[in-house]
């Protein structure tokens, strides 16, 4: 018994006859006169099919290409159903987290915007794994670095996402990281006029770092000096032309991108250095602080200008793949938990949580790290010893080691990359279980753990990198209006890339 109504069955039968007739008609136009007899036989076949299905051979009152259009509509509806199913699943997770953690709630304000579903998918032309992704500082452009050394650029506004706006053969081996400068860089001065523009850098397993013009995507210079794979790079937030890099050769290097010189090299790990993050000190004379993570299963905080190690974070049981500073406006979510649960941290001085040195001088306090033990860890870093007119010294408390605050558990395989939401409340993590997960720091104080509030599953392979659109240059703000300022500069663009050879744009 058919599941279709008589009217639906009649439409389907007529669409089948129309489809077969169109194929024969299209083929007949390309045949020579002597081959027409075969076509006539095929036309007889159409008449027989129409007679068998009890429908007329004429389809003048039927929509052109009716069967194909019905088929494509079904596929679109299936994709829409899958997206809506994912969204319902995410909303259920949020509701469950709210009930389990004392009513913590995510508002619909722009400041709390979170990605929910894939808006566009950008396939790589070279069919190569995507190792790194980056969003342009102000244009609607997405950039990806691939395992064959290619850089691909897509325009979000283009109707056809399958064709990149530009594809550059950038390196002879895999591109491991792409990073944009935090603000325009003055590369040259011509006829007394400033020539500032955004630049970006790429690093590779071919041992090189390349600096590129952000307007033309043309290569400016090559930085060489590492003796092994260059794992990651980051521009200085306080000095736009300064670039930091880490490598499998165990070193951290500091470069001046305007002339290509390496200004400092230091070794802080005993094995491959995988990733780094940089933050500017609140007291400008201190310069920058660098977080690095390594195959030696440790995270190291260093003073950039001197290379001095300030503290060590030990607790992972496998290679650490990614590390990120938390912004100072994240502190409120964690401070409350530590003050209410001081008995869980007997080695932590009670006054440390409220110590003004973090906010007034250092500009750092908490960080997160992720690794091949499938865990994201939250840390409190002890404050460095600050001296007048001299570089800081290692922390004097807890033997210069950080305090492990909490584990963010849920990933089923290696966690490869981290991203911090501009509002400082949410942490993004992604990895080899094909998922991107969102964690809410505000649930730590209410429920005693950092809860996963979203899980995004659209990649068909490992997720290697995630990136959110950077904020425009910050203005002078007070603590009272910092979130309002961040909200005004947010672009709500989030991308991911992985071994399924695609970049996904999330909405």
Swiss-Prot record:
Coiled-coil annotated residue ranges, if any: 72-98
GO CC entries: cytoplasm; microtubule; microtubule associated complex; spindle pole
Compartments reported by the entry: Cytoplasm, Cytoskeleton; Cytoplasm, Cytoskeleton, Spindle pole
GO function terms (MF aspect): dynein complex binding
WD repeat start and end residues: 125-164, 170-222, 225-265, 268-312, 315-389, 410-449, 474-507
Keywords of this entry: Cell cycle, Cell division, Coiled coil, Cytoplasm, Cytoskeleton, Microtubule, Mitosis, Repeat, Transport, WD repeat
Residue ranges of the TM segments: none
Matching SUPFAM superfamilies: Lissencephaly-1 protein (Lis-1, PAF-AH alpha) N-terminal domain, WD40 repeat-like
SMART domains (UniProt xref): WD40
Gene Ontology BP, a term: cell division
Main location: cytoplasm
Function comment: Positively regulates the activity of the minus-end directed microtubule motor protein dynein. Plays a central role in positioning the mitotic spindle at the bud neck during cell division. Targets cytoplasmic dynein to microtubule plus ends, thereby promoting dynein-mediated microtubule sliding along the bud cortex and consequently the movement of the mitotic spindle to the bud neck.
HAMAP family: lis1
Assembly and interaction partners: Self-associates. Interacts with NDL1 and dynein.
Family the UniProt entry places it in: Belongs to the WD repeat LIS1/nudF family.
Protein name per Swiss-Prot or TrEMBL: Nuclear distribution protein PAC1
Lineage: Eukaryota, Fungi, Dikarya, Ascomycota, Saccharomycotina
Gene: PAC1
């Amino acid at each position: 018994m058919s599941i279709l109504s008589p009217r639906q069955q009649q439409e389907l039968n007529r669409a089948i006859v129309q489809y077969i007739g169109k194929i024969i008609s299209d083929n007949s136009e390309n045949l020579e006169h002597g081959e027409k007899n075969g076509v006539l036989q095929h036309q007889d076949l159409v008449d027989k099919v129409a007679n068998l299905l009890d429908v007329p051979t004429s389809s003048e009152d039927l929509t052109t290409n009716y069967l194909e259009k019905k088929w494509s509509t079904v596929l679109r509806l299936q994709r829409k159903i899958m997206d809506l199913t994912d969204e319902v699943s995410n909303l259920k997770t949020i509701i469950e987290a709210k009930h389990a953690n004392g009513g913590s709630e995510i508002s619909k304000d722009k400041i709390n915007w979170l990605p929910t579903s894939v808006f566009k998918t950008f396939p790589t032309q070279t069919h190569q794994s995507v190792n790194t992704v980056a969003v342009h500082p102000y244009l609607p452009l997405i950039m990806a670095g691939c395992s064959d050394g290619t850089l691909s650029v897509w325009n979000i506004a283009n109707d056809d996402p399958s064709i990149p706006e530009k594809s550059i053969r950038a390196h002879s081996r895999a591109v491991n990281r792409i990073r944009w400068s935090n603000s325009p860089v003055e590369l040259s001065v011509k006829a007394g006029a400033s020539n500032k523009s955004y630049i970006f850098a790429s690093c590779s397993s071919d041992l090189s770092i390349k600096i590129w013009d952000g307007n033309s995507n043309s290569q400016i210079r090559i930085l060489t000096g590492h003796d092994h794979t260059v794992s990651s790079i980051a521009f200085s937030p306080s000095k736009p032309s300064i670039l930091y890099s880490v490598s499998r050769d165990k070193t951290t290097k500091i470069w001046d991108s305007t002339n290509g010189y390496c200004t400092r090299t230091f070794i802080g790990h005993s094995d491959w250095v995988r990733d780094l993050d940089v933050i500017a000190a609140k007291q400008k004379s201190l310069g920058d602080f660098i977080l690095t993570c390594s195959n030696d299963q440790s995270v190291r905080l260093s003073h950039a200008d001197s290379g001095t190690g300030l503290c060590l974070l030990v607790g992972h049981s496998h290679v650490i793949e990614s590390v990120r500073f938390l912004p100072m406006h994240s502190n409120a979510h964690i401070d409350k938990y530590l003050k209410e649960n001081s008995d869980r941290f007997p080695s932590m001085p009670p006054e440390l949580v409220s110590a003004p040195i973090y906010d007034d001088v250092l500009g750092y306090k908490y960080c997160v790290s992720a690794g091949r033990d499938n865990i994201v860890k939250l840390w409190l870093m002890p404050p460095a010893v600050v001296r007048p007119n001299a570089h800081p010294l290692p922390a004097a408390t807890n033997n210069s080691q950080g305090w492990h605050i909490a584990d963010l558990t849920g990933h089923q395989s290696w966690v490869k990359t981290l991203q911090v939401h501009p509002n400082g409340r949410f942490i993004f993590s992604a990895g080899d279980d094909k998922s991107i997960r969102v964690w809410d720091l505000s649930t730590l104080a209410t429920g005693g753990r950092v809860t996963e509030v979203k899980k995004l599953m659209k990649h068909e392979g490992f997720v290697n990198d995630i990136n959110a659109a950077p904020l425009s240059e910050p203005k002078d703000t007070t603590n009272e209006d910092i979130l309002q300022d961040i909200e005004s500069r947010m672009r709500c663009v989030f991308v991911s890339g992985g071994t399924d050879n695609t970049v996904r744009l999330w909405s």
